[in-house]
From Swiss-Prot:
Gene name of this polypeptide: KCNE1
Biological process annotations from GO: membrane repolarization during action potential; membrane repolarization during ventricular cardiac muscle cell action potential; negative regulation of delayed rectifier potassium channel activity; potassium ion export across plasma membrane; regulation of heart rate by cardiac conduction; regulation of ventricular cardiac muscle cell membrane repolarization; ventricular cardiac muscle cell action potential
Entry protein name: Potassium voltage-gated channel subfamily E member 1
Molecular function in Gene Ontology: delayed rectifier potassium channel activity; potassium channel regulator activity; transmembrane transporter binding
Organism of derivation: Felis catus (Cat)
Residues carrying Phosphoserine: 102
Record note on modification: Phosphorylation inhibits the potassium current. N-glycosylation at Asn-26 occurs post-translationally, and requires prior cotranslational glycosylation at Asn-5.
A family per Pfam: ISK_Channel
Spans through the membrane: 44-66
Protein family membership: Belongs to the potassium channel KCNE family.
Amino acid sequence: MILPNTTATTPFLNALWQGTAHQGGNTSGLARRSPGGDDSQLEALYILMVLGFFGFFTLGIMLSYIRSKKLEHSHDPFNVYIESDTWQEKDKAYLQARVLESYKACYVIENQLAVERPNAHLPEIKPLS
């Protein structure tokens, strides 16, 4: 396992401090230069925070609205009917009744002559061409 080298940053920080201390004798140069690089990071953080709060606020409103609608209409007869399985059973029974009704309404007319003489020649209509 490779351990991280934590002492490598110390010479870099010392050199940076020496360079800024010799420029003006005070640390105001460092204070003037650092905000330029950090502003863009802070701006991105600010935008992410605003979007996060907006998303959290919108999600909260949406969930509370859905919950209130669910509680408001929980005892509505239509919703109770939809949530129950009785409509599926009734629909299935209705479909079976319709199939039986249509089956009973269909009938076949039997041609007695065709049944008595199955090998007899039946006349065909020839198309005009």
